[in-house]
Amino acid sequence: MNPSEVASAGIHPIELCVHSILSSNLEGIYQAITELRESQALLVMKFNQVKKSFMDEQELLQEEGSLKEELARVNQLKKRLDKLTELYAELARKCGAL
């Protein structure tokens, strides 16, 4: 607006300056808020990816824990099988001697 239009509209030049300064600041604030929302959305997406990765790793660790239990059980069964094999060999030897 040129000075004659401002005067005819009944707007004081200082009011126009204040409005201009406040408007540009408000637009900057609005833009900053928009950028913050976008970065917040990206951070939430990254957080969800990290959370999913963490949960997957936790599941793997729990599976490894259950595998350790199963391996211990297999080892116990192997020991029992070895003892039974020895007993069978001894019985076969005794039966062969008869």
From Swiss-Prot:
Q: Name one GO biological process term.
A: endosome organization
Swiss-Prot/TrEMBL keywords = Coiled coil, Endosome, Transport
Subcellular location(s) of the protein? Endosome
Highest rank taxon of the organism: Eukaryota
In its keyword annotation, does this UniProt entry include Ion transport? Answer: no
**Major site of localization recorded for this protein:** other
Coiled-coil positions are 55-98
Presence of keyword Cytoplasm: no
An example GO CC term for this entry is: BLOC-1 complex
What does the function comment of this entry state? Component of the biogenesis of lysosome-related organelles complex-1 (BLOC-1), a complex involved in endosomal cargo sorting.
The entry sums up its family as follows:
Belongs to the SNAPIN family.
Subunit and interaction comment:
Component of the biogenesis of lysosome-related organelles complex-1 (BLOC-1).
What protein name applies here? Answer: Biogenesis of lysosome-related organelles complex 1 subunit SNN1
Origin species: Eremothecium gossypii (strain ATCC 10895 / CBS 109.51 / FGSC 9923 / NRRL Y-1056)
As recorded in Swiss-Prot or TrEMBL, the protein's gene is named SNN1
